[in-house]
Swiss-Prot record:
Gene3D superfamilies for this protein: lpxc deacetylase, domain 1 (3.30.230.20), lpxc deacetylase, domain 2 (3.30.1700.10)
Organism annotation: Thermodesulfovibrio yellowstonii (strain ATCC 51303 / DSM 11347 / YP87)
EC number: 3.5.1.108
Active site: 259 (proton donor)
Family, per entry: Belongs to the LpxC family.
InterPro entries cross-referenced by the UniProt entry: Ribosomal_Su5_D2-typ_SF (IPR020568), UDP-acyl_GlcNac_deAcase (IPR004463), UDP-acyl_GlcNac_deAcase_C (IPR011334), UDP-acyl_N-AcGlcN_deAcase_N (IPR015870)
Encoding gene, per UniProt annotation: lpxC
Top-level taxon of the source organism: Bacteria
Protein name in UniProt: UDP-3-O-acyl-N-acetylglucosamine deacetylase
GO molecular function, one term: UDP-3-O-acyl-N-acetylglucosamine deacetylase activity
Cofactor: Zn(2+)
Length: 292
C-alpha cells in the first residue's frame, strides 16, 4: 500500500497565468494526513478540493470551481503531485489560475524534489480498474483496462508537418515522469491566437511558456523532444486523471483526447463502477526517496 505523503517544507513560486496574463504567487504548504489536495484562493478566502465533482470547465485547461469561484489550469501541478504520491498539501494562490511557468511541469517537479517528500504513517487506497471501460465523443476515444501499475498510451493527430501522427506508451512513475513527461511544454498554433484572445484565453501566452507553431514549424525555438506534443498530452492526462483522488492502477489508451474527453471519461468510469478501492502493494519506482 502506498503511504499518504506531503511535502517536507513550503514551496513558493511566481509565474504568469497563461490565460489571465496575471502575475501569480503560488505557495505549496505541508498538510496533515487525510487533508487531501486543497487549493486556496487567498484573494477570495476560499478553499476548493482537487476532486472530480468540482470540475466546472475544460476549455483549453481544466478548471475547478465552487459557487462561482474558480481556479484554472490546475493540470500540470496536479500531475506532478500525483506522480510523486503527494496526497496532502495546501496550494495557495492570489489569483484565479495556477501559473504556467515554462509551459511544462519541470519547475513544479524540481521544486517538489528540492523541498522533499514526507511519508505520513497512514496508507491510502488504490483506485484500481477492474473491468474494461470505453468512452467515445466526437473524434476522441478512451479505453481503460486492468493493469498492474499505471500506464498511458496516447495517440494524437494534427494536420501539421511537425506533428501529424504521434503516439507514445509509457509507464507512469517518478523516473519516467521526470525524464520524459514533465519537460514537455504546452503548444498552440499561430493561426488560432486571435480566436483565443477574443474569447478570453491565452492572454499570458508567449514563446517563453508555450510552443507556438506556424505553418512550417516552431516559432522562435526548438523542441525538447521530437514527439514533445504527445508527451505534453500525457502530462495533461495525468493531471486530469488525478482528480479521481487516489493513486491509480490501470492502463489508459487515449486517442485524440483533451481535457473535456478526459473528464467526461472519468465521469463515465465512476458511473459504470468498473473499479475498486483496493488495499494491496503499489508498484511505482521511487525517485523521491533518493532525491530528498
Amino acid at each position: 500500500m502506498p503511504f499518504q505523503k506531503t511535502i517536507k517544507s513550503e514551496i513558493s513560486l511566481t509565474g504568469i497565468g497563461i490565460h489571465t496574463g496575471k502575475k501569480i504567487n503560488l505557495n505549496l504548504i505541508p498538510a496533515q494526513r487525510d487533508t487531501g489536495i486543497v487549493f486556496y484562493r487567498k484573494d477570495r478566502n476560499f478553499p476548493i478540493k482537487a476532486k472530480l465533482p468540482f470540475v466546472v470547465d475544460t476549455s483549453f485547461a481544466t478548471t475547478l470551481g465552487v459557487d462561482g469561484i474558480k481556479i484554472r489550469t490546475v493540470e500540470h501541478l496536479l500531475a506532478t503531485l500525483h506522480v510523486f504520491g503527494i496526497t496532502n498539501v495546501f496550494i495557495e494562490i492570489d489569483s484565479s489560475e495556477i501559473p504556467v511557468m515554462d509551459g511544462s511541469a519541470i519547475d513544479f517537479t524540481k521544486a517538489i524534489l528540492k523541498a522533499g517528500i514526507a511519508k505520513q504513517g497512514k496508507t491510502v487506497s488504490l483506485f484500481k480498474i477492474t473491468k474494461p471501460v470505453y468512452y467515445e465523443e466526437s473524434h476522441s476515444k478512451i479505453f481503460a483496462k486492468p493493469y498492474r501499475g499505471f500506464k498511458i498510451t496516447y495517440k494524437i493527430f494534427y494536420e501539421h508537418p511537425l506533428i501529424m501522427e504521434q503516439s507514445l506508451s509509457i509507464e507512469i512513475n517518478e523516473q519516467n515522469f521526470l525524464n520524459d513527461i514533465a519537460p514537455a511544454r504546452t503548444f498552440g498554433f499561430l493561426k488560432d491566437i486571435n480566436y483565443l484572445l477574443k474569447n478570453g484565453f491565452a492572454k499570458g501566452g508567449s514563446l517563453d511558456n508555450a510552443l507556438v507553431l506556424d505553418e512550417k514549424g516552431v516559432v522562435g525555438g526548438n523542441l525538447r523532444f521530437k514527439d514533445e506534443f504527445v508527451r505534453h498530452k500525457i502530462l495533461d492526462a495525468i493531471g486530469d486523471l488525478s482528480l479521481i483522488g487516489y493513486p491509480i492502477q490501470g492502463h489508459f489508451i487515449i486517442e485524440k483526447g483533451g481535457h473535456t474527453s478526459h473528464i467526461n471519461f472519468l465521469r463515465k468510469l465512476i458511473e459504470t463502477g468498473c473499479y475498486e478501492l483496493a488495499e494491496e502493494p503499489y508498484f511505482n519506482f521511487q525517485l523521491s526517496a533518493q532525491a530528498v
